[in-house]
Amino acid sequence: GCCSDPRCKHEC
């Protein structure tokens, strides 16, 4: 998921 991915974590 995005919240676990440093590349898009800022979207959470």
Curated annotation (Swiss-Prot):
<dbReference type="GO" id="GO:0005576">
    <property type="term" value="C:extracellular region"/>
</dbReference>
<keyword id="KW-1015">Disulfide bond</keyword>
<keyword id="KW-0027">Amidation</keyword>
<comment type="function">
    <text>Alpha-conotoxins act on postsynaptic membranes, they bind to the nicotinic acetylcholine receptors (nAChR) and thus inhibit them.</text>
</comment>
<comment type="similarity">
    <text>Belongs to the conotoxin A superfamily.</text>
</comment>
<keyword id="KW-0800">Toxin</keyword>
<dbReference type="GO" id="GO:0030550">
    <property type="term" value="F:acetylcholine receptor inhibitor activity"/>
</dbReference>
<dbReference type="GO" id="GO:0099106">
    <property type="term" value="F:ion channel regulator activity"/>
</dbReference>
<feature type="disulfide bond">
    <location>
        <begin position="3"/>
        <end position="12"/>
    </location>
</feature>
<keyword id="KW-0629">Postsynaptic neurotoxin</keyword>
<feature type="disulfide bond">
    <location>
        <begin position="2"/>
        <end position="8"/>
    </location>
</feature>
<keyword id="KW-0964">Secreted</keyword>
<protein>
    <recommendedName>
        <fullName>Alpha-conotoxin-like Reg1d</fullName>
    </recommendedName>
</protein>
<keyword id="KW-0008">Acetylcholine receptor inhibiting toxin</keyword>
<dbReference type="GO" id="GO:0090729">
    <property type="term" value="F:toxin activity"/>
</dbReference>
<dbReference type="GO" id="GO:0035792">
    <property type="term" value="C:host cell postsynaptic membrane"/>
</dbReference>
<keyword id="KW-0872">Ion channel impairing toxin</keyword>
<feature type="modified residue" description="Cysteine amide">
    <location>
        <position position="12"/>
    </location>
</feature>
<keyword id="KW-0528">Neurotoxin</keyword>
